[in-house]
Amino acid sequence: MSLKGKTLLVSTITLAAVVLVALLGGSVFLKAGQNVRKAFEEYELAVEALDKLGELETKVALFVNNAAKIEEVSSLFNELKKVADKIPSLKEHMDALERNISEIISGKTEVVSRIQSSVDQVKEDIMANLDRTRENLDKEISYSSELIRNVLFIVLPIVAVASGVFLFVMISRSLRLLKPVMEASRSLRNNDLTINIQEAKGKDEISTLLNEFKASIEYLRNNLKDVQTETFSVAESIEEISKANEEITNQLLGISKEMDNISTRIESISASVQETTAGSEEISSATKNIADSAQQAASFADQSTQLAKEAGDALKKVIEVTRMISNSAKDVERVVESFQKGAEEITSFVETINAIAEQTNLLALNAAIEAARAGEAGRGFAVVADEIRKLAEESQQASENVRRVVNEIRSIAEDAGKVSSEITARVEEGTKLADEADEKLNSIVGAVERINEMLQNIAAAIEEQTAAVDEITTAMTENAKNAEEITNSVKEVNARLQEISASTEEVTSRVQTIRENVQMLKEIVARYKI
């Protein structure tokens, strides 16, 4: 059986035991519950019977005293009979009660005492029956509790002990099977593959694991033997390849040295030719640069002359605009002065309005006082006087606002006047400087025109010299090309040799790496005991 099946078996047995205990306890509780329900029903019937007996006793007494009808007594007795069918102790007395009630109906009142004694006897029997039922119920509950307690304290421990023993046996066997695996793991950690594991004959997971582990160790041992054999063979081949590669490298080094000597001599010849060519090219280049510079200088001189003339025209326009700005600034000063005068006049008007408002306020106050003295006749005049006083106060407040605004405008006008004066001064100064600059630009234009004529003469002479230098440079360039072709051919051969040498060195490096890896592999394989 597999480990999973064994574990499932233990769980099933334990669960079955628990279910058995639960079913047993449930049946006991079910039986006890039925008894309790039956006792409770009997108790309810007894209580109902006692109530009916009490009511019957009361109705009989009322009937004897002509306070109740015979139908009520009969109806109540019939209800009591229905209850008595379910209570044996009450049913025994129903015939006697029925005879006594019949006699009372026929007019025999002395029977009432017998009915009362019968009812009391029935009540005593019912109460005695209830006591017996309660005692039986207590015994039933005690028995059920004792039975369940015995089951819980006897059956469950037995099941738990049995399950524990079974699990202990199963785990012990599993650990015994795993012991060779642990020993083999320690041997593998010590690089020892000579360990021999006995084959397990079980069919559970632990036995399967042990057999798979045994097969893995044997597979690893066989592979390591093959690796050892192949490693020694590869090491011998690497040594032979390394020796052959060293011989090729030495031959390539000798050829490379001879090619370096040839290349050095050709490079020396080429360098001399190149120096001569470079000198003539430098002369030609310098001559061309001088000619170009002279032509550029002449062109710049023409441009400078044109720009100077344009600058003179622009400067004249600036002078005219500056003078116009100066005139406008003076006009602004006049406007600002007129504005300040108008502000002073507005201030005077505001003060006059303010004085009138104060006088109006005083007159309105006096009118209000006189209206108050006049009583009812002056009430309307007092209202008008109060409105006039408010209007005077609003006028006074508005005049104050106007004065404040006028003061702000006057301050701004003063600032504008100062700025305008400063602009006028700066414009006059700029006009003087512009006049001086105009005179100097005229002088510069004349000087640049003279320089332009001299540069044109220099450019013509340099062009003739440049043509002669170009002829010398052409001849030297052809010699330099021939030397370069020879040098390039030698360099190409040398480059090919260098590539071959580099490839050989790379092969040597890789062979050395392989040699080191093989040596490391030999050391690793040698650690294992096979």
Swiss-Prot record:
Residues 152-222 form the HAMP domain. One of its GO terms (molecular function) is transmembrane signaling receptor activity. It comes from Thermotoga maritima (strain ATCC 43589 / DSM 3109 / JCM 10099 / NBRC 100826 / MSB8). Keywords: Cell membrane, Chemotaxis, Membrane, Methylation, Transducer, Transmembrane, Transmembrane helix. The modification Deamidated glutamine is found at Q498. The modification Glutamate methyl ester (Gln) is found at Q274. The modification Glutamate methyl ester (Glu) is found at E281, E505. It comes from the Bacteria. This is Methyl-accepting chemotaxis protein 2. Disulfide bonds: none annotated. The gene is mcp2. The chain crosses the membrane at residues 9-29, 151-171. Pfam families: MCPsignal.
